[in-house]
UniProtKB/Swiss-Prot annotation:
The lineage of its organism: Eukaryota, Viridiplantae, Streptophyta, Embryophyta, Tracheophyta. This is Serine rich endogenous peptide 2. Residues 45-59 have a biased composition (Low complexity). Keywords: Apoplast, Cell membrane, Cleavage on pair of basic residues, Membrane, Secreted, Signal. GO terms for cellular component: apoplast; plasma membrane. It comes from Arabidopsis thaliana (Mouse-ear cress). One of its GO terms (molecular function) is receptor serine/threonine kinase binding. It comes from the Eukaryota.
Length: 79
């Protein structure tokens, strides 16, 4: 079993090495590689909303505590 596994791995390595050196390999992708500027044009530009210059980058202050309601004198419970 280990012998067969070693042969399979060796065969895969040979195929990959020979494929990487030849340009018309059956395992190679049929598409031509695109120039780097072409795929960069397809990227969507994303603007960061948290840049150091924007005010949203500063740490947010915690909201002020709500004003406490006036204390009303507690009336004794009536039964």
């Amino acid at each position: 079993m280990a012998n067969n596994l070693g042969l399979v791995i060796l065969l895969l390595v040979i195929v990959l090495v020979s494929c990487s050196k030849s340009s018309d390999c059956a395992l190679a992708s049929p598409q031509k590689s695109r120039p780097s500027s072409e795929w960069r044009r397809k990227l969507i530009p994303v603007r960061s909303s948290r840049s150091p210059r924007s005010p949203s980058f500063a740490p947010k202050k915690p909201p002020p505590p709500p004003p406490s309601p006036p204390l009303s004198p507690s009336s004794p419970p009536s039964n």
